[in-house]
Amino acid sequence: MKYKIFAGTCLVLIGLFAATSLYYKNEQARMYDFLAQNNASTFVRDHSPTLGSEDAKVFLVEFMDPACETCAAFSPLVKQMINANPGKIKLVLRYAPFHDGSDYFIKILEAAKRQGKYWETLNVMFKSQPYWASHHNPQPHKIWQFLPKAGLDLDQIKKDMNDPAIEKIIEQDIADAKTLN
């Protein structure tokens, strides 16, 4: 008799757990659907760099930090995924400057975008990251020796990266990241 009560209680608890998990999962999906439909600009801003087809139905929004080792490691994999699915995926990059000195590198990227060299500059940054992006001792000045590989006008980069509009882009991306939790 005790076994039947124990077994019955276990089945009820397992069923309750499964129902609660399913409910939670559905609520999360509804919440993200609501965010996507009612706050589309939270995912993609006019200033956001994009890669892939404009007609893509799948948007991959990545909040990244140019000083992040994981971001650098995943970048080639993301590009492979986009290339393996031509016309189907659009990558949207947003900024999440979590590491010391990241704002500096984002400003360089945004200045490079004005020269039409955003993706080349990001690739150079990711490849040279071990030389300048120590988490305990970042050395932003060291990036300048690698930037000529992106074909940039370095004097213009130094001027453009101080534009207050770039700071507003960083602030907007941080605010959107917080909104999305």
Where are these regions (language model features)?
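Cysteine-centric redox/oxidoreductase cores and disulfide-bonded domains
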Residues: 2-6, 10, 22-25, 97-181
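Extracytoplasmic thiol/disulfide redox context detector
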Residues: 1-101, 162, 166-181
